[in-house]
């Protein structure tokens, strides 16, 4: 082992915890499609042969939750008992009730409105207390840490070669892990280790799997990154066999992959999961907003690394605190960058929802392969549209 080695992991959409995330977000999307003002908090548990969906909801629409669950499982690829789980025949239990009126009153009429404010953005209070972080760095062109970006792309490619028939013996469950060497200036310099585990059918030998995965998944992905990878250590299915997988191998639960969902451990995390939550829940919307903030700080050239924290009190619109840190990479003081952030970004929940257009059925797409670093049209928090305003506000 040489150098300073940082590691991040990802999982495929067929990992049990990720199936749970995708089910929760698919239910959320179905409700938002019928009623964009739906309040949704949905959790999913799945194990051998059964799925349980529970939570609290306020909506004017009717959603056939069992149908949403089955369609998502089948789309992921669990469509036969031969694979250990079958969306056609698995049991689906639904236990969804109404949202607490005590919570609703604080969200519907924020503390500021109740104490005299007439600003429309003060009307909606935060759906809970809590702290959320956003992060960005210049490791990659999407301003994300390199280890998590490579791990996510490997997981995506592993799924792609399964679904398009390139490697038909693969099954949906899988994990990736990437170790990158960093130099003394925190710059990525070399791929050190790649770990990839993939569920497969009964008849596939490890030597075949390793050769195929290296050829069709790992080497093509590594070739897209401008960092040396010659001589990297490769570990494919280190247990030697991965036939039993998915919910048959491990129970899955919504919100169990919060580091995979974010920055691969390179940044702090407030602890709140995303999936199954509508944007009135600041666990989700404010984390997206702080990614937007941090990415724009780096895109503006104010720093090469930025982490931004925001915190809320339940029922209150204005954050109780904001903290911006650039780890010594800022071109001006962190305090000045923080002042610029507060001048350019409105971090009240209603303003975040408005500015990022979050009342849309976009969330199932976020639930696998990372909420950040994928510059898709729906991922409005990946825009760098405030970079010029930040530079001006910082006096540059």
Curated annotation (Swiss-Prot):
Cofactor, free-text remark: Binds 2 divalent ions per subunit. Binds 1 potassium ion per subunit.
Pathway(s) per entry: Amino-acid biosynthesis; S-adenosyl-L-methionine biosynthesis; S-adenosyl-L-methionine from L-methionine: step 1/1
Listed Pfam families: S-AdoMet_synt_C (PF02773), S-AdoMet_synt_M (PF02772), S-AdoMet_synt_N (PF00438)
Domain of life: Bacteria
Positions that bind K(+): 43
One example of a Gene Ontology biological process annotation: S-adenosylmethionine biosynthetic process
Annotated region (Flexible loop), positions in chain: 99-109
Coiled coil ranges: none
EC number(s) stated in the UniProt entry for this protein: 2.5.1.6
GO function term, MF aspect, one: methionine adenosyltransferase activity
Residues that, per the record, bind L-methionine: 56, 99, 250, 281
Needed cofactors: Mg(2+); K(+)
InterPro entries: ADOMET_SYNTHASE_CS, S-AdoMet_synt_C, S-AdoMet_synt_central, S-AdoMet_synt_N, S-AdoMet_synthetase, S-AdoMet_synthetase_sfam
Cellular location(s): Cytoplasm
Known catalytic reactions: L-methionine + ATP + H2O = S-adenosyl-L-methionine + phosphate + diphosphate
Keywords of the record: ATP-binding, Cytoplasm, Magnesium, Metal-binding, Nucleotide-binding, One-carbon metabolism, Potassium, Transferase
Binding sites annotated in the UniProt record for Mg(2+): 17
One cellular component (GO) term of this entry: cytoplasm
Matching NCBIfam families: metK
Subunit relationships: Homotetramer; dimer of dimers.
Family, similarity comment: Belongs to the AdoMet synthase family.
Purpose of the protein: Catalyzes the formation of S-adenosylmethionine (AdoMet) from methionine and ATP. The overall synthetic reaction is composed of two sequential steps, AdoMet formation and the subsequent tripolyphosphate hydrolysis which occurs prior to release of AdoMet from the enzyme.
Protein name as it appears in the record: S-adenosylmethionine synthase
Upper classification of the organism: Bacteria, Bacillati, Actinomycetota, Actinomycetes, Propionibacteriales
């Amino acid at each position: 082992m040489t150098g300073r080695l940082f590691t991040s992991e990802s999982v495929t959409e067929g990992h049990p915890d990720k199936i749970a995330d995708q089910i929760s977000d698919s239910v959320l999307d179905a409700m938002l499609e019928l009623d964009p003002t739906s309040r949704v908090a949905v959790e999913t548990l799945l194990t051998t042969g059964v799925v349980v969906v529970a939570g609290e909801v306020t909506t004017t629409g009717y959603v056939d939750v069992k149908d949403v669950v089955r369609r998502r499982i089948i789309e992921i690829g669990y469509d036969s008992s031969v694979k250990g789980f079958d969306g056609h025949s698995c049991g689906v239990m639904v236990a969804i009730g109404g949202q607490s009126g005590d919570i609703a009153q604080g969200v519907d009429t924020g503390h500021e409105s109740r104490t005299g404010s007439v600003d429309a953005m003060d009307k909606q209070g935060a759906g809970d207390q809590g702290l959320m972080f956003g992060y960005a760095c210049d490791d990659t062109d999407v301003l994300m840490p390199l280890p998590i970006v490579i791990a996510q792309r490997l997981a995506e490619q592993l799924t792609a070669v399964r679904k398009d028939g390139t490697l038909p013996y693969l099954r949906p469950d899988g994990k990736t892990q990437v170790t990158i060497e960093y130099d003394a200036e925190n710059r990525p310099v070399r791929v050190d280790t790649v770990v990839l585990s993939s569920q497969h059918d009964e008849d596939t030998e490890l030597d075949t799997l390793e050769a195929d995965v290296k050829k069709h998944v790992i080497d093509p992905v590594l070739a897209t990154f401008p960092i040396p990878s010659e001589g990297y250590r490769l570990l494919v299915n280190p247990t030697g066999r991965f036939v039993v997988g998915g919910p048959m191998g491990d129970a899955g639960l919504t919100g169990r992959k919060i580091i995979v969902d974010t920055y691969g451990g390179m940044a702090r995390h407030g602890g709140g999961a995303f999936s199954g939550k509508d944007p009135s829940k600041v666990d989700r919307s404010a984390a997206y907003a702080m990614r937007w903030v941090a990415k724009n700080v780096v895109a503006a050239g104010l720093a090469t690394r930025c982490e931004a924290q925001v915190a809320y009190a339940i029922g209150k619109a204005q954050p109780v605190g904001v903290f911006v840190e650039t780890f010594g990479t800022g071109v001006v003081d962190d305090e000045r960058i923080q002042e610029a952030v507060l001048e350019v970004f409105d971090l009240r929940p209603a303003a975040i929802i408005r500015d990022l257009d979050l009342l849309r059925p976009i969330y199932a797409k976020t639930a696998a392969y990372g909420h950040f670093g994928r510059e898709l049209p729906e991922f409005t928090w990946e825009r760098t549209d405030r970079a010029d305003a930040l530079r001006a506000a910082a006096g540059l």
